[in-house]
């Protein structure tokens, strides 16, 4: 302690002694100083002695360090200040220097703290006076240079020392003094030192503020931990929590653009600018409230101690931060500054708890301390809860009118913040000082001050910590001061100022953009883009702007933020869009001619423009990189690991991955402390922004339309739902939308249309004029639109205005009525025109104006002074619209008129001035506006950004590649295109992607249709870029693969030319051309023609140079890269590979279709990639193969056989490889794979290719049979196609292989082939149907029979087989997959083949049924017979009559009998299932116009019933009877009775040719219609005679050529019906009584009659073989009715002589008149038999009565009819019938006989008169005898009876 004092005393003593020793002090005017020094020395001496140390006390500490504070020496050094103060005030430089030096050391070592109150000025501390004294030493430029240096040193020490505290005005004074020294000093070293010192001071001031907040945050954090620990009683992690403040030191991203240019500064300076002092003066003397002094020194000491203890805790963290910030200049200061920063500041922390709000509007910073002493800091300032501190005052947004001072809502949470604020604000104001007029002088104070202030501001911003970046006070300061300053300096013509402004802007954009949304917009709109867009702006300005833009464009966050916050904001300008458009123009070199730039300048500007565009795209790529999948970092196959070389490629790929936004600006969104931004910004929802963007585009479109035609614009906006329909809505729109053309708005409002008037009224009513004077109101009204020219329009507007004005100001007494206001308004308009229009020469005087307005106030005058005031105001300022915010960019016309550089400069400066004004006005206007800023986080934004800007990008890159050979430009363009493709790919924006890829493809020069002249390096690079794109973005290229693969295809051709190799054309096409080539000398080689390189004659030199330039394309790297695209196809994802393959096939197709030279390059590649990709998952592979297979389909059918052969052979190899892999059950990949073989077989008619396909398939079967599964389908399909071929070798090979499969492969691999079992059978049936090879046909049917054996032997295999038809029950699968196909195909054979094969097929089909039918289910039979009955299907029968007839007589016949056999064999199963169908089928047969078939039908009916009747149920019998009934009814030939010859009917043989006699003879003859149809022999029923054409029709066709065909057809049909009727009668007879029974009976009856032995004993037939016994009486009656109906019809016909004659004449049935005798007799005979049989049947007693009744009626009717017969032959026919009748009657009992005999008696008597045959007579005799006996007329002689009985 003692040592410390000693040092201090030594300092003081030496300094005082030095001052006293100076000769100047001896002078009188320094007496006061001298005295003060002496007194001080004396006191020091006394004190030293008093405090000499006791012996033995150890020497504590180093003497130079400040003593440990205690009460005793707290203010010791301070009391010796007076001599120094006086010394400083002396004008002697030496004394001043000594004094300053001592003060500096005392402050530095902490001996002088100045904490005591200043005795001279109440409310101030001593330290303030000390600083003031130091600053006072600077007396302007004339101050001694040494003194200047000492002042700088002392002030730096004061500001940076941690032992003393200076705040507010004192800090400002210190800063200002250094600033002035920099400006005023002529000494370069002093200037440099002053500047460095300033930088360091600012660093310290701001760092202290940040540190204080940091400490406080830590303190809070500890508190929180402690409390948590207390609450939880659980261990809490001891890591420092990541408080938002820990990340406040930004990396210095923006380089110091303003490097200290000390060398340039001229030491000579003029007088210090007074205004500068004035500016800072008022900030002086701000007084710190006495509150802080009331706290006792003891409190401060303890506070300091506690804090310093705490500081130990954070030593580690705090240590480096100040070091980072403070750039030491004065070496000795470093040690002190590095010391604990916290200590000095901490003391005041408690004292200035919340040191007051800055009063609004006060320029001098008077701080009212409104804090209560000792208030804990946390109440005002809680860093860990930022929301508390950041609450945005509600006044903020409304405060735009009030431009000075921070908003009242914001408060400083600490005095250190206020210090920083004051310094910052002063610098802003300094930078705004205007420069003197004329060209800027680099040495002038104004300019140097401006530059320095901007440099310092830049430094502050670059090092800004979290508090500065988030505290509302600073944000407001930036808005209100810095941004306004920038708007002024941002258009400076001094490059250095301009450059600094840009750097500051960059920093703001980087760190503060979340708070400065509006300001950034103004800066971009009014400065950056304006300078880029104006043709007059200088190259330097453009260059600097574009340099800055390079930085902005390189930061992804900034780029996306600009789009989201401006282009998607309805009220903001489209900055991103404009930026891209402007850059694109610059990159295209547009507008540079007018500027008179040199070529070098133009090129460098173009490059920069391109660089910016590429940067923007890189940012977009970077921003969306998470969505990009690099195909080379993954493999879709996963079969082999990538090789070493590939790994290295992946690690350093030439891909876009290396493009980051390398020099990206540091963005607030990433800093934790940006809570302000997150709080203010809306959520980042891309969809929402897209909607906004769309709305904005609609609004912009609407405004454009409005500015051309208002009504159209409004209508458009209403249609789009962006504008309401009411007048109020539209009026509001006119008020709010500033982009509307004011003239058009005026025209719209003035229009006389009813709606327009309503809008105008609403528009005026939305103005509030209350409390405004009349002229102000009028100005306000006319601000928004330009008054229209027509008087009536103005009139309407003024009228409404006057009314509204009075409505708003009802209390006014000036105007008597609205009329007055209206007239006055009108007069004001006239006055403003008069006074301010250049056209009006004689201006109106005030008197004239007053006179003009006489008597307008309800015949009274308005006060003269009132009118006079109006006149004066208008004269001073005309009424005009407010200046529109948008600066109009000079039109084209002015651009061209710039004659010289000088004139351009002049114009530019004028524009700059205007621009600065606008920018400043706008900045001030928005300085209080709070606009939410969204920090973009979502990668989706890139999509709409790119969609918006892709065209200007493309234009720039295309033009660049097109017209510039500079390699940098080319590489930038290519890089840009790559990025653009990447973005379009990632977001699958197809149109844009395709456009860029096409552009690339175009610049490869490979696809041009005109000839290639020569390839430049840029074209080669383009090819490489294209290949790289294919490599890195393959997954996303979609349709763009087309362009790429087209180029690769052409590249191969180019390589061939480059290397001079003859292209490997397909031999087939080149063969013919070889000859022509050799002969002609001046013709180009083919390959050149192929590429379209040359026309007719050739310049060989040119070709040589082309070859050379193209040679580069076959460099190793290109070849490898191309190859890598194909080998790398395995890494493409599932969708991409499909696109790739699809387009590869398309290109291959183009190659092959080339008329001159088909090439197979791509086809070979297809084969290669098929090999590479075969290992993909089956799902992907099948999609790939769908495309490739289709391509092979087409190629395999190529008319060029060589191509087709290559295709088929490639297919074979691929298939072999594919089949080797085998296939699991239920998969179908082989089927898809082998399908092209089928297609080629189907479509290619070339025998060579067809043969080759069959051979390939045969080879596969032979070598891979074990692996084939679903592929069998295709194999059979191919053989199926081969089966119908006419080429024997093809059919033979195919059939051999099929046979091999069916006999051997099926045996071994049956389960694998089940799926294609049907196909196999189908294939065999196709062979069977090939009529050209009958042997094969028969063999094929044998193989089908063989297949049936497989089904029968292995039903289990079918049951277990599962496939697509999972809905088939397992037990039915045998049927569906096995039996059904076999039987179905056989039915097909039957339907399609010639007779012998058909018959064989039919036989086999029924053989299979008979052999295996026992295993069939009921419903199978149903399906089966559906097939079988197809044989009879009318639709399927042959068309031609003869064939049809043949078919019916052979196949149908055969089938019919076969069906009946099967039915009989499986009756139990089939009776339910099949009977109806069989009956239906039989019914069908009898309806056909085929006699044979009709006979067979009835025949089969008979067979079925006779064979199975015993097992029939009652129901079945009913059905049988009904069927018979139906047949009967259908086949009654009614038309025989109704037919009439048509009038023009050709007559029968003409009467002239025949005599009457002959005619009569013929007419007497009659022919039975049934005669031609031979009766069926009962013993051999089945072999019915085959009559194909009924003789009737034969007769007609031969004999009567004139007869009409329809008649023949009809007659033939009628004939068949007659036949069927007869057959049916026979059938019923056979069924009921068994075949041949009746015939036998007739024969017996005849024989008995001949012997005259008819027995009339009652005898019942019991030996019934027929079905009689199974039929019920009702059923029998039904049959009976049929028979009788048939009988009656025949009777009717036979009796109708006239009709028969007509038919005979028409040629029906030959030589004589037709009749139906057989039908007439046999039907009745059968009926009688049935009735008599029933009559004698004991079991049918119940029916006897009816039977008797029927018998009596039938018999009497028959006898009556017989009596009417005239023709002998007719009666003859009845012989058997009468015999039967009489015999039967004779055999009934007497009793019954009575009834019958009495009934018939008279009729029988009548019969006697006919000439009857002996047998009949014999029976009649018996009858009459019996009558005698029964009626007891006579007694029979015994002997006679006896004889009979024997």
Swiss-Prot record:
Gene: Arfgef1
Molecular function per GO: guanyl-nucleotide exchange factor activity; myosin binding; protein kinase A regulatory subunit binding
The keyword Transferase is assigned to this record: no
Record CDD domains: Sec7
Residue ranges annotated for the SEC7 domain, each copy included: 688-877
Compartment(s) where it occurs, according to its Swiss-Prot or TrEMBL record: Cytoplasm; Cytoplasm, Perinuclear region; Golgi apparatus; Golgi apparatus, trans-Golgi network
Chain residue ranges for the region called HUS: 554-574
Region (DCB): 2-224
Main location: cytoplasm
Organism from which the protein derives: Rattus norvegicus
Subunit structure: Homodimer. Interacts with ARFGEF2/BIG2; both proteins are probably part of the same or very similar macromolecular complexes. Interacts with FKBP2. Interacts with MYO9B. Interacts with PRKAR1A and PRKAR2A. Interacts with PPP1CC. Interacts with NCL, FBL, NUP62 and U3 small nucleolar RNA. Interacts with DPY30. Interacts with PDE3A. Interacts with KANK1. Interacts with TBC1D22A and TBC1D22B.
This protein's name: Brefeldin A-inhibited guanine nucleotide-exchange protein 1
Ways its activity is controlled: Inhibited by brefeldin A.
């Amino acid at each position: 302690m003692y040592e410390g004092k000693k040092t201090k005393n030594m300092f003081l003593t030496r300094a005082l002694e030095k001052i006293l020793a100076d000769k100047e002090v001896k002078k009188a005017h320094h007496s006061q100083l001298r005295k003060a020094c002496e007194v001080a020395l004396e006191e020091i001496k006394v004190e030293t002695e008093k405090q000499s140390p006791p012996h033995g006390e150890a020497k504590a500490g180093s003497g130079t360090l400040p003593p440990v504070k205690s009460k005793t020496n707290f203010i010791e050094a301070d009391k010796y200040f007076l001599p120094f103060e006086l010394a400083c005030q002396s004008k002697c430089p030496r004394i001043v220097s000594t004094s300053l030096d001592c003060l500096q050391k005392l402050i530095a070592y902490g001996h002088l703290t100045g904490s005591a109150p200043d005795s001279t000025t109440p409310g101030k501390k001593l330290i303030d006076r000390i600083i003031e004294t130091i600053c006072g030493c600077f007396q302007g430029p004339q101050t001694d240079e040494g003194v200047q240096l000492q002042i700088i040193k002392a002030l730096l020490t004061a500001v940076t020392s941690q032992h003393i505290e200076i705040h507010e005005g004192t800090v400002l004074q210190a800063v200002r003094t250094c600033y002035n020294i920099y400006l005023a000093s002529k000494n370069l070293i002093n200037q440099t030192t002053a500047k460095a010192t300033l930088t360091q001071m600012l660093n310290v001031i701001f760092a202290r503020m940040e540190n204080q907040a940091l400490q406080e945050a830590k303190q809070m954090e500890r508190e929180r931990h402690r409390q948590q620990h207390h609450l939880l009683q659980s261990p809490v992690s001891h890591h420092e929590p990541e408080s938002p403040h820990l990340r406040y030191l930004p990396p210095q991203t923006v380089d110091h653009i303003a490097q200290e240019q000390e060398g340039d500064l001229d030491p000579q300076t003029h007088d210090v600018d007074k205004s500068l002092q004035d500016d800072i003066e008022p900030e002086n003397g701000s007084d710190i409230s006495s509150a802080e002094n009331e706290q006792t020194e003891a409190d401060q000491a303890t506070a300091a101690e506690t804090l310093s203890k705490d500081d130990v805790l954070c030593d580690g963290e705090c240590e480096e931060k100040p070091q980072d910030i403070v750039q030491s200049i004065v070496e000795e200061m470093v040690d002190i500054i590095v010391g604990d920063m916290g200590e000095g500041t901490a003391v005041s922390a408690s004292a200035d708890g919340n040191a007051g709000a800055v009063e609004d509007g006060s320029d001098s910073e008077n701080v009212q301390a409104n804090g209560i002493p000792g208030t804990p800091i946390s109440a005002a300032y809680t860093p860990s809860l930022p929301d508390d501190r950041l609450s945005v005052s509600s006044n903020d947004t409304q405060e735009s009118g009030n431009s000075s001072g921070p908003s009242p809502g914001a408060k400083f949470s600490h005095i250190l913040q206020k210090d920083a604020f004051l310094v910052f604000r002063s610098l802003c104001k300094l930078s705004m000082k205007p420069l003197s007029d004329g060209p800027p002088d680099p040495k002038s104070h104004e300019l140097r001050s401006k530059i320095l202030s901007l440099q310092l501001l830049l430094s502050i911003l670059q090092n800004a910590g979290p508090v500065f970046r988030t505290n509302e006070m600073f944000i407001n300061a930036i808005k209100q001061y810095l941004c306004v300053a920038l708007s002024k300096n941002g258009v400076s013509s001094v490059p250095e100022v301009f450059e600094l402004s840009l750097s500051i802007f960059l920093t703001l954009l980087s760190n503060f953009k979340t708070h400065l949304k509006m300001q950034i917009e103004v800066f971009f709109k009014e400065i950056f883009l304006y300078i880029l867009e104006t043709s007059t702006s200088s190259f330097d300005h453009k260059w600097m702007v574009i340099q800055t833009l390079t930085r902005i464009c390189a930061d992804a966050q900034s780029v996306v933020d600009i789009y989201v916050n401006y282009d998607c904001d309805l009220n903001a300008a489209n900055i991103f869009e404009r930026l891209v458009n402007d850059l694109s123009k610059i990159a295209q070199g547009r507008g540079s001619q007018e500027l008179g730039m040199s070529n070098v300048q133009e090129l460098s500007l173009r490059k920069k423009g391109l660089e910016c565009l590429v940067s923007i795209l890189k940012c977009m790529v970077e921003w969306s990189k998470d969505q990009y999948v690099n195909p080379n970092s993954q493999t879709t196959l996963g079969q082999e690991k990538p090789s070493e070389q590939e790994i290295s490629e992946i690690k350093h790929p030439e891909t876009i991955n290396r493009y980051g936004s390398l020099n990206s600006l540091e963005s607030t969104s990433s800093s934790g402390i940006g809570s302000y931004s997150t709080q203010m910004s809306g959520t980042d929802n891309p969809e929402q922004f897209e909607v906004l963007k769309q709305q904005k585009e609609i609004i912009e479109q609407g405004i454009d339309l409005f500015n051309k035609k208002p009504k159209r614009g409004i209508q458009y906006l209403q249609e789009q739902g962006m504008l309401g329909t009411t007048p109020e809505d539209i009026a509001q729109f006119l008020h709010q939308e500033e982009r509307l053309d004011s003239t058009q708005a005026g025209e719209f409002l003035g229009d006389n249309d009813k709606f327009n008037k309503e809008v105008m009224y609403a528009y005026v009513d939305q103005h509030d004029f209350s409390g405004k004077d009349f002229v102000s109101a009028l100005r306000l009204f006319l601000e928004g639109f330009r008054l229209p020219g027509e008087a009536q329009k103005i009139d309407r507007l003024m009228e409404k205005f006057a009314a509204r004005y009075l409505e708003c100001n009802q209390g006014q007494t000036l105007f008597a009525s609205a009329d007055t206001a209206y007239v006055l308004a009108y007069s004001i308009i006239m006055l403003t025109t008069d006074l301010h229009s250049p056209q009006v020469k004689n201006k109106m005087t005030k008197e004239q104006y007053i006179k003009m307005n006489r008597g307008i106030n309800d015949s009274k005058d308005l006060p003269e002074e009132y009118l006079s005031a109006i006149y004066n105001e208008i004269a001073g300022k005309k009424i005009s619209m407010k200046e529109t915010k948008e600066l109009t960019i000079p039109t084209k016309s002015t651009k061209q008129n710039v004659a010289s550089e000088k004139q351009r400069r002049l114009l530019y400066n004028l524009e700059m001035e205007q621009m600065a004004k606008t920018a400043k006005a706008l900045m001030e206007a928005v300085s209080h506006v709070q606009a939410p800023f969204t920090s973009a986080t979502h990668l989706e934004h890139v999509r709409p950004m790119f969609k918006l800007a892709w065209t200007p990008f493309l234009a720039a890159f295309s033009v660049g590649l097109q017209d510039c050979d500079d390699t940098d430009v080319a590489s930038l363009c290519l890089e840009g295109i790559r990025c653009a493709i990447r973005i379009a790919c990632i977001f699958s924006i197809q149109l844009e992607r395709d456009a860029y890829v096409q552009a690339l493809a175009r610049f490869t020069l490979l696809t041009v249709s005109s000839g290639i002249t020569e390839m430049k390096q840029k074209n080669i690079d383009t090819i490489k870029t294209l290949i790289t794109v294919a490599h890195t973005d393959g997954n996303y290229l979609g349709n763009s693969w087309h362009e790429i693969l087209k180029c690769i295809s052409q590249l191969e051709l180019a390589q061939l030319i480059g290397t001079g190799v003859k292209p490997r054309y397909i031999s087939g096409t080149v063969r013919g051309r070889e000859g022509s080539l050799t002969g002609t000398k001046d013709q180009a080689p083919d390959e050149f023609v192929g590429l379209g390189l040359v026309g007719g004659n050739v310049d060989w030199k040119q070709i040589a140079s082309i070859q050379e330039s193209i040679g580069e394309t076959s460099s190793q790297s290109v070849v490898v890269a191309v190859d890598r695209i194909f080998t790398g196809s395995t890494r493409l994802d599932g969708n991409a590979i499909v696109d790739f393959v699809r387009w590869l096939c398309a290109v291959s197709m183009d190659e092959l279709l080339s008329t001159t030279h088909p090439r197979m390059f791509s086809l070979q590649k297809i084969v290669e990639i098929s090999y590479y990709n075969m290992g993909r998952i089956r799902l992907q592979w099948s999609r790939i193969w769908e495309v490739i297979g289709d391509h092979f389909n087409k190629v395999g059918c190529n008319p060029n056989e060589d191509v087709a052969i290559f295709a088929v052979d490639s297919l074979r190899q691929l298939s072999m490889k594919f089949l080797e892999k085998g296939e699991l059950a239920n998969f179908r990949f082989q089927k898809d794979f082998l399908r092209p073989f089928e297609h080629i077989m189907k479509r290619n008619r070339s025998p060579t290719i067809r043969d080759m396909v069959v051979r390939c398939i045969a080879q596969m079967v032979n070598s891979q049979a074990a692996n084939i599964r679903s592929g069998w389908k295709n194999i059979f399909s191919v053989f199926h196609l081969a089966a119908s071929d006419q080429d024997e070798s093809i059919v033979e090979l195919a059939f051999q292989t099929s046979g091999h499969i069916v006999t051997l492969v099926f045996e071994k691999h049956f389960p694998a082939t089940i799926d294609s079992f049907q196909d196999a059978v189908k294939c065999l049936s196709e062979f069977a149907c090939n009529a050209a090879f009958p042997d094969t046909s028969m063999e094929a049917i044998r193989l089908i029979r063989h297949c049936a054996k497989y089904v029968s032997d292995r039903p289990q295999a079918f049951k277990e087989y599962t496939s697509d038809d999972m809905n088939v029950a397992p037990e039915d699968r045998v049927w569906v997959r096995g039996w059904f196909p076999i039987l179905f195909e056989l039915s097909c054979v039957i339907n399609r083949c010639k007779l012998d094969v058909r018959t064989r097929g039919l036989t086999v089909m029924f053989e299979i049924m008979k052999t295996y039918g026992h295993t069939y289910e009921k419903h199978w039979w149903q399906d089966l017979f559906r097939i079988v009955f197809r044989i009879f299907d009318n639709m399927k029968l042959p068309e031609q009559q003869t064939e049809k007839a043949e078919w019916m007589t052979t196949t149908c016949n055969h089938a019919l009998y076969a069906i009946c056999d099967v039915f009989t064999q499986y009756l139990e199963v089939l009776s339910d299932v099949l009977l109806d169908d069989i009956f239906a089928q039989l019914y069908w047969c009898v309806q056909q116009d085929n006699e044979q078939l009709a006979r067979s039908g009835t025949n089969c009916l008979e067979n079925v019933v006779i064979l199975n009747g015993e097992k029939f149920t009652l129901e079945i019998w009913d059905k049988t009877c009904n069927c018979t009934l139906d047949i009967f009814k259908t086949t009654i030939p009614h038309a025989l009775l109704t037919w009439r010859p048509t009038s023009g009917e050709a007559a029968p043989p003409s009467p002239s040719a025949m005599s009457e006699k002959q005619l009569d003879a013929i007419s007497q003859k009659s022919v039975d219609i049934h005669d031609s149809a031979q009766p069926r022999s009962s013993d051999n029923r089945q072999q019915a005679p085959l009559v194909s054409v009924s003789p009737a029709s034969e007769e007609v066709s031969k004999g009567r050529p004139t007869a009409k065909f329809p008649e023949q057809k009809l007659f033939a049909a009628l004939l068949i019906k007659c036949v069927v009727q007869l057959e049916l009668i026979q059938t019923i007879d056979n069924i009921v009584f068994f075949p041949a029974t009746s015939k036998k009976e007739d024969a017996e009856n005849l024989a008995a009659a001949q012997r005259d032995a008819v027995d009339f004993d009652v005898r019942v037939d019991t030996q019934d073989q027929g079905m009689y016994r199974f039929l019920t009486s009702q059923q029998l009656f039904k049959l009976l009715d049929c028979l009788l109906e048939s009988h009656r019809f025949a009777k009717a016909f036979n009796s109708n002589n006239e009709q028969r004659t007509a038919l005979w004449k028409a040629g029906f049935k030959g030589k004589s008149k037709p009749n139906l005798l057989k039908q007439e007799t046999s039907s009745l005979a059968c009926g009688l038999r049935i009735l008599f049989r029933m009559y004698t049947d004991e079991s049918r007693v119940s029916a006897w009565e009816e039977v008797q009744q029927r018998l009596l009626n039938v018999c009497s009717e028959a006898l009556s009819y017989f009596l009417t017969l005239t023709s002998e032959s007719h009666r003859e026919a009845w012989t058997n019938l009468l015999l039967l009748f009489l015999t039967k009657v004779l055999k009934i009992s007497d009793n019954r006989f009575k009834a019958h005999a009495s009934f018939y008696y008279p009729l029988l008597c009548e019969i006697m008169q006919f000439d009857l045959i002996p047998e009949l007579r014999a029976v009649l005799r018996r009858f009459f005898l019996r009558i005698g006996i029964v009626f007891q007329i006579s007694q029979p002689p015994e002997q006679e009876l006896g004889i009979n009985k024997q």
